[in-house]
A protein has these predicted regions:
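Short glycine- and acidic-rich boundary segments immediately preceding or forming the N-terminal edge
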Residues: 62-63, 69, 74-111
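Active-site beta->alpha N-cap acidic-glycine motif
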Residues: 91-201, 211-220, 227-228, 302, ...
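Alpha-helical scaffold elements lining the catalytic groove of polysaccharide deacetylases
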Residues: 145, 192-222, 237-283
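Active-site-proximal beta-strand/loop segments in catalytic clefts of secreted hydrolases
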Residues: 137-140, 163-167, 190-191, 232-236, ...
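Hydrophobic alpha-helical membrane-insertion segments, chiefly the h-region
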Residues: 12-25
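N-terminal Sec-pathway targeting helices
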Residues: 1-12
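Juxtamembrane proline-rich low-complexity "stalk" or linker regions positioned immediately after a signal peptide
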Residues: 25-84
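C-terminal domain-boundary segment and adjacent tail
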Residues: 124-127, 170, 296-357
Length: 357
């Protein structure tokens, strides 16, 4: 018995020594190191390749989500939607709503070269499946309305994309931060919602670029961290000469599949009816609404309930890479003297309150 034990111990020792030699050889192998450098170089080359993307390249499903609400500790799928150098969205708190709409899946958008989405204007990338909906909101953040929209989304354990006006974001940075903290995707919608297809912007591309870039910078600064290279033109007016510019900036352009025209509606029930009627006809779609509109904020709980009842599933769009702002336009935003440089922006109720009435 002792002989067997001694032999076994000797064999184990020899095995460990052999394993150590193999590891040491690999660690010192210059061929392996060179292969690693080559791999990194190829990756950088791929990033710089601005050739048009195929659907599978521009849009990629992240680790699939179930249609049930996302729990607090379910961070694997959320983190997989971003590369290591981009921040993963904050997951929801544990969902206590058994009837919540939840998320079906998360879609990663590779914005290299400025791909365009939304079949109302662009037909190349139609990535949604039947009964899938991507919720998008324009013109915020706005007090009262944006918090109503956010609460409804959180109550239903789901997410959306917000295209914010830069000037609005500088007025209410705390609202932009709340959206980001809740894991919403935040893109931009110009600095002051100017129609870039009209003069003076139609005649002066530099003014148009400034309107776009100041919006990008302002939203980024209001959030206080990375935002998405997602952009939507005001009034869905997309001047052709600006499309290549956004391509050089690797900013994706979003039109819509379904415009609810909620800005023309004053009753929440009409907003719900518009969205559901058009979805029933289209079967799926990127849904355009406005968190600037009070009726839309009021409509959200019922709209999300009807989406769940109708068998629709929510898809959340996230970027592969975060936006990069340009210093020139960062300074322009700061020069407006409207931007709060505080990292701890306080809510209005904490600054001003009625003590006698």
């Amino acid at each position: 018995m002792r002989i067997v034990v001694v032999v076994f111990a000797a064999l184990m020792t020899l095995g460990l020594v052999a394993f150590g030699l193999v590891v040491a050889q690999k660690a010192s192998d210059p061929t392996a190191a060179a292969a690693g450098v080559s791999s990194l170089q190829n990756t950088e080359s791929a990033k710089n390749d601005k050739a048009p993307l195929h659907l599978g390249e521009a849009v990629k499903a992240a680790a699939p989500f179930t249609s049930t609400p996302v729990a607090q500790n379910d961070t694997t799928a959320v983190a997989a939607a971003f590369p290591a150098h981009a921040p993963a969205p904050t997951p929801f708190a544990a969902c206590n709503n058994p009837d919540a709409l939840g998320l079906s899946r998360v879609i990663e958008i590779d914005t290299a070269g400025g791909p365009a989405f939304g079949t109302e204007h662009f037909k190349q990338y139609d990535f949604l499946r039947d009964k899938e909906v991507a919720l998008t909101f324009d013109d915020g953040p706005w007090p009262g309305n944006t918090p109503m929209v956010l609460k409804a989304l959180q109550d239903n354990c789901t997410k959306a994309t917000f295209f914010e006006i830069g000037e609005h974001a500088t007025w209410r940075p705390e609202l932009a931060k709340q959206l980001a903290a809740a894991g919403m995707t935040i893109g931009s919608h110009t600095w002051s919602h100017k129609d870039l297809a009209k003069n003076p912007y139609a005649k002066d591309i530099e003014q148009a670029k400034q309107e776009i870039e100041m919006g990008v910078s302002a939203v980024y600064m209001a959030v206080g961290g990375p935002t998405a290279p997602f952009f939507r033109f005001p009034d869905l007016q997309q001047p052709r000469d600006l499309m290549p510019y956004l391509g050089t900036r690797n900013i994706a352009i979003f039109s819509t599949d379904i415009d609810t025209f909620d800005f023309k509606l004053r009753r929440p029930e009409d907003v719900v009816k518009s969205a559901m009627t058009k979805l029933a006809k289209n079967g799926k779609g990127i849904l355009l609404m406005h968190d600037f509109q009070h009726a839309t904020g009021e409509a959200m709980p019922e709209l999300l309930r009807q989406l769940k009842a109708g068998g629709y599933k929510i898809v959340h769009m996230v970027p592969k890479e975060p936006i990069t702002t340009l210093a020139k336009y960062d300074e322009m935003v700061r020069a407006r003297d409207k931007y709060s440089t505080s990292n701890n922006a306080r809510s209005e109720s904490s600054v001003v309150k009625t003590i006698s009435e």
